[in-house]
Amino acid sequence: MNFKAYNRVIEEGGAYGHMMNVHEDYTLQFEDLQRIIKQALTGGIKGEIKEKTDGQALAVSHRANRVIFARNKGHYKAFGKNAIRGAKGIAEFFGEHPNDNVKEAFTFAAKDLEKGIMSLSDRQKQMMFGDGWRWVNIEIIWPATVNVIPYNHELIVLHNFREYDEDGNTVGGDFNEYGRMLAGMIKQTNEHVQDKFTITSMPLLKMPRVKNFEQTIGDYLGEINNLMSKYGLNPGDKIGRAHV
């Protein structure tokens, strides 16, 4: 895509929105990218690394003893009063979708997730969802609906949570432990392996030094150097300058 000629905003990720890749942060400098690549290839990134999975986005909450879902920002308003109600509601919401694989992915995932969440105690559901003002963002990995990365397993990946006020505005949230906590609760009830999906949290990885380090780092840094050379840019320039 020629960003200069085709300057549209692409909205992805359902109600949550698109989670940017590193190269989409146009405020980064080229030397930042070089540093990230070197740290990744040498095993120098400290701690655990979260894999950015490539699936279909949905948000889930619980209100008035019912599992509810959000696919657009309007569903968050009034603490989920007008959200999609249960797996049946998801089936109706996607009922006229032209892609049967997408329809199946969301419908089956909603059924399995609904069953998993309803296995929790009332105290757990209240703690996790707060009766519709706290939502957990999930990603549906369904091999038939592959975007870019192919997968061999059917997974519901629980990510972070966000809290919303009555008007549907974000007022809080996290990026780390919430999905893992909810997945752990569901696993304790032995409902994490469902009819179609396994309910889990974001994969955590450790990156060791690559074996063919010299060749690999030369290839990656060579691509960045070629891009800088093409547009007459320096390591201290922001990568967004290559797109304007």
Q: What do the PLM-derived regions correspond to, one by one?
A:
Residues 1-9:
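Short acidic, low-complexity intrinsically disordered linear motifs used
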Residues 3, 243-244:
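N-terminal secretion/transport leader regions
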